């Protein structure tokens, strides 16, 4: 799995009566993650950034919010804590065997991007939460 990559696609999160659909641009390096989340029409809604000093959520027209973890801010934004390290693993074909209370991950479609095999469509479920990721573009980055 490349240590650094850039990907873009669509993210959907459904939990109970709440459903969020967004465009996602994701840049991952060894030390950080950046998610730029946009509306389906392309308007930037939020930026989630993480690094050695914690994570920051910046929403359009609002003051930046900080937390110790990326997961805490995805929970604030999307209603569910998402671990970018786990999702990077899923993206690169590492769908873990599900244990009680963990995500049940299905790689619904795969693709090849250069020399990298990766998931094109991922569905992850846990309890009443469904997360879907569709990857439209991907490239490994040099560090």
Q: What spans do the regions from the language model cover?
A:
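A short, Trp-centered hydrophobic/proline-enriched beta-strand micro-motif
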Residues: 1-17
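Beta-strand-dominated lipid-handling architectures at cellular/organellar boundaries
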Residues: 6-8, 19, 23, 27, ...
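Short beta-strand segments that buttress and anchor functional surface loops
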Residues: 9-13, 35-38, 120-126
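Gly/Pro-enriched, hydrophobic low-complexity segments
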Residues: 92-143
């Amino acid at each position: 799995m490349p240590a650094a990559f850039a990907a873009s696609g669509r993210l959907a999160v459904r939990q109970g009566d709440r459903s969020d659909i967004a465009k996602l641009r994701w840049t991952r390096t060894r030390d950080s993650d950046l998610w730029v989340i946009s509306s389906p029409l392309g308007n930037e809604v939020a930026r989630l950034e993480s690094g050695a000093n914690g994570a920051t959520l910046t929403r359009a027209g609002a003051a930046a919010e900080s937390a110790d973890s990326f997961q805490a801010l995805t929970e604030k934004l999307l209603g569910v804590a998402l671990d970018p390290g786990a999702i990077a693993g899923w993206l690169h074909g590492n769908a873990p065997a599900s244990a009680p209370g963990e995500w049940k991950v299905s790689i619904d479609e795969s693709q090849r991007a250069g020399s990298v095999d990766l998931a094109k469509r991922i569905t992850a479920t846990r309890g009443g939460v469904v997360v879907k990721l569709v990857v439209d573009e991907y490239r490994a980055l040099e560090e």
